[in-house]
């Protein structure tokens, strides 16, 4: 005869076991730059991913995700090793990466392991031309190009000097913007540089003496921006604005380089500090602030969106029984929802055709959205320079 106490214990154990079946934990690999040249952007993305996991695990109930993070040190070979190590640890998918030259080989490695690779850090057009069925990204070069071109149209730019890194995504963007500007009758000077260069005074001096443009556009990365703006601050070319793209109009850059950032313009979906209107946005901002004791910026928002879409697809695939049969990619392709970066859906190549960006300007320690005018949170300072 089983005592009442033992019966209660057995029932509780059975219920716990049943709950365990339903509340399965899925391990997701995070391959991201936490050190090296891309560390500022990588850290912002990583914080957004962690925030997504916190919110998902708190609100989903039925399923949980566990993050395993490996620092790729901003190095393509180490990114490949990170993906291979994560695959050996049984992750169900990979999220992360920053820089197309890193994401390319890393996502190739994920494809060989039949793992979904989700990113917001690689916009090179060739990434979605490889025929990979497991590659997904929420942003792309056309979204950045449109933002830059809209800004130039709005301020009436007549001439531009484009300083661009010879890396894939930066070259793509520079040449596409050149083509579009020349079609509008804008005079364009092109200045390519090797990613190893740290002294930008020769190229800035050439622009100052020969091009004499309205605007300098930088298609580059964090450390490049710093070098170019520093050289321009010394040589003081007679331009009206210094404009860049990703990872420039961020709170982190303002904090780290307060003397270089005033009036500099870069892509930014969010003003800083930001005030969200939607319940999802408010929960994201509140959770992020509790975790990291600071205000969100757009890099963290990108990290959050890509991770949350992945986690939601994992949960759906687990529910319909397709996750363990390689069905996660198909489930991700069913995504179509409004997110903190706008509507996201994925085409056959894993690209988000709805992606569009805005331009933000550093003003008095804040980032103000200045373009497109219809979505501006404040007026643009133009002409406006850091010197």
Predicted region positions:
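Bacterial N-terminal signal peptides that target proteins for export
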Residues: 1-9
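Sec/Tat signal peptide C-region and signal peptidase I cleavage site
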Residues: 17-23
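Extracytoplasmic "Venus flytrap"
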Residues: 29-50, 70-77, 99-101, 163-171, ...
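Beta-alpha junction/loop-to-helix N-cap segments that form part of ligand/metal-binding clefts
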Residues: 41-45, 55-129, 138, 194-200, ...
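Extracellular/periplasmic Venus flytrap/periplasmic-binding protein
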Residues: 81, 124-126, 133-235, 273-283
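Periplasmic-binding protein-like
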Residues: 86-98, 118-120, 161-164, 211-222, ...
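Extracellular/periplasmic periplasmic-binding protein-like sensory domains
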Residues: 232-304, 318, 373-378, 382-387
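Segments of small-molecule ligand-sensing domains
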Residues: 290-300, 311-371
